[in-house]
């Protein structure tokens, strides 16, 4: 079976369009990582940039530094996990063979 080089180039163009669409979708992802029953919430975009950190005021004074650091770290890690899951769900059908 002969492979037509023009078909290959056409497919490469479609692949590039798919990649561009995926990049656009990823840039629009926004997730919230949470810790301590929403005492700490980290908002992160699809490029893993933290956009916001919210700490419930009524708990802020009651937490020691170590507990607060732990909750921020947990919320951040939760957000990273959620971004990765969103990226995976948006890209698995768009990239051939699940690459």
From Swiss-Prot:
It is found in: Cytoplasm, Nucleoid. The keyword DNA-binding applies. The keyword DNA-binding applies. One of its GO terms (molecular function) is DNA binding. Keywords: Cytoplasm, DNA-binding. Pfam families: YbaB_DNA_bd. One of its GO terms (cellular component) is cytoplasm. It comes from the Bacteria. Disulfide bonds: none annotated. Gene3D superfamilies: Nucleoid-associated protein YbaB-like domain (3.30.1310.10). Homodimer. Binds to DNA and alters its conformation. May be involved in regulation of gene expression, nucleoid organization and DNA protection. NCBIfam families: DNA_YbaB_EbfC. Belongs to the YbaB/EbfC family. This is Nucleoid-associated protein EbfC. It comes from Borrelia duttonii (strain Ly). The gene is ebfC.
């Amino acid at each position: 079976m002969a492979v037509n080089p023009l078909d290959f180039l056409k497919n490469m163009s479609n692949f590039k369009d798919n990649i561009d669409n995926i990049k656009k979708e990823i840039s629009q992802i926004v997730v919230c990582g949470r810790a301590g029953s929403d005492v700490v919430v980290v908002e992160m975009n699809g490029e893993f940039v933290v956009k916001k950190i919210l700490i419930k005021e009524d708990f802020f004074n009651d937490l020691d530094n170590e507990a607060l650091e732990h909750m921020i770290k947990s919320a951040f890690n939760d957000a990273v996990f959620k971004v990765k899951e969103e990226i995976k769900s948006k890209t698995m059908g768009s990239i051939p063979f699940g690459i």
